Every structure is written in C-alpha cells, then in structure tokens.
Amino acid sequence: MGLDSEIFSILNVVRIFIVATVAFFVTLLITPAWTKVLHKYKLGKQIRTDTAFKSLHTEGGPIAAKLHQAKEGTPTMGGVVMWATVVIITIGFWLLANFFDGFWSTMNFFSRAQTWLPLGVMIFAALLGALDDYMGILRVGPKGGGLRMSHRMLLYILAGVVGAWWFFFKLGFNSINIPFMGDFIIGWWYIPFFIFTIVATAFSANETDGLDGLAAGIFLTMFGAYAVIAFDQGRMDLVVFLSAIMGSLVAFLWFNIYPARFFMGDTGSMSLGVTLGVVAMLTNTPFLLIPIGIIFIIESGSVIVQLTSKK
C-alpha cells in the first residue's frame, strides 16, 4: 500500500509539472499573435472614473491609482491569453483522454467534482470582463466607458448563485471551515456565504490590475498557495487545473513585468478572481483568503474608502 501511494504521488507530481509546462509554452506561443491584435485594433487601456481611479486628479488617492494614470493607452485584454490557454489545455487533455487510453487518460483532469465549476465560472467571468474591457475601450457606458458597477455586481452575484447551487445541491457542501476551530455546518446559510465570497473576491481582484506585474504576481502567489492546500487535501485534478493557471501566469509575467507590453484587463482579473473564490470554497478554506489575499483586501478597502468618502 505504501508503494502504491508513493507511485500515485510521483505520478501526480509529473502531471502537475507537464500541465504547468505545457501551459507556459502555449501562453508564450500565442501571446505575440494576440499582442499584434491588441496593437492593430488599438485595444488600449482607458482610465476608469467610476472606481477609485476617480481620485487620480485629487490628493490622497490610492498609490496604485496614481500610478495607473501614466499607463493609459497601454494595450489591455491581455488576460485572454491566460484563460484561453487554460481552456485549451483542459479541453485538449480531456479530448485526448477520450480518444486514447494509458498516458492520455492519466493526464485528464476535467472532473465533475473538482474542475467543472472552476472552469465554467472562469469562462463566464472572462467573457463578462472582455465585454467590460471592450466597452471601456470604445468609451461606451457611464463615466469613461464600461459596465456600470451595479451591473457588474449583479453579474458577480449571478455567478455566485450558480456556483452556490452547484456546491450545495450537486456536491453536498453545507459547512465552512474556520481555522483553528474546525468545520461548522451552516445549512442554507452556505448559499449566501458562497455568493458573498465570490463577489468579494471578484471585486477585490478587479481593482489591482494595471500595474506592471502586480496583479499577475499576486494571483500567481495565491493560486500557488491554494495548489498546496488542494494537494494536501488530495484534490489532484484541482491541483493540476491550478498548475495550468500558474504556468500561464508565469508566461504572462514574462511579458508583463516592467515595461509591460499589455495588462490583463477585466477579462483577466475578473476570471481569475472569480475562479479563486470558487477554489477557496471548493477546498473549504474561504477564511484563508484573508491572509493569502491581503494585498487585494488592502487595495479594495482603499477603493471603498475613496468612494464612500466622496459621497
């Protein structure tokens, strides 16, 4: 039994390494082509005026917001290369496993219990973010373009409702873990708690994009932390899925560190933020989001203070 367990662990480490490596190189390959598209169609960053960036021309705004001003016009929607890579790899290995046995069957990590929902919400949030980005580029919408904050929040809530339904009714989740205290069954309260976690994570993540390597670097650290947690829990398909995200993020950072060629945009930050929230709930460690995502919390807290103080 010990030998079988050791072989199983080694096999999963190999899966993680292979998927992360493939994700890294796929992102490296498609990024130059996508960058050309961004430049050709002038899909550049516009500074928002409906969030903390409203304070760019006033004293005392968040440091990140002040730095954003110099970045206006830098191509955005770079996050497409990340989530597209994850989708391609996940579906690609799943298709190969359906046509071939042996090695390819082992590499498949597309499972109902661990990766269906994270991938599904990633795609949903990515498309929502892409719409928001494009509206901002065209300056369609209120205060500089993009979706209204209220509309984005409603869509976050929708994603949270779908996720809560899946977790509660399909996967049987009804408890939360509080560090050092254990699991607590909360019954139907699990649904609003799930929705709150998704909305809070998505909102916080969405406020940090736009500085060279900042959002991608933070996401890489956070997904890495949750990969360790998932590995410890034996959720190997989820770990492999997270390794695909991390491999793509490393490649994204290759292009995104100073001077950044592009930013991930809302299509990147929204998709990764919502996915992170789902992963936290899937591993039943939502309260660990607080120490793991402290930078997101600080920046989003600064945003909220700015908005409420101006009102």
Regions found by a protein language model. Give the residues of each.
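Predominantly late transmembrane helices and immediately cytosolic-facing juxtamembrane segments
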Residues: 300-308
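"…together with the soluble PPM/PP2C metallo-phosphatase catalytic core" -> "…together
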Residues: 1-263, 267-301
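Short beta-alpha connecting loops at secondary-structure transitions
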Residues: 289, 308-311
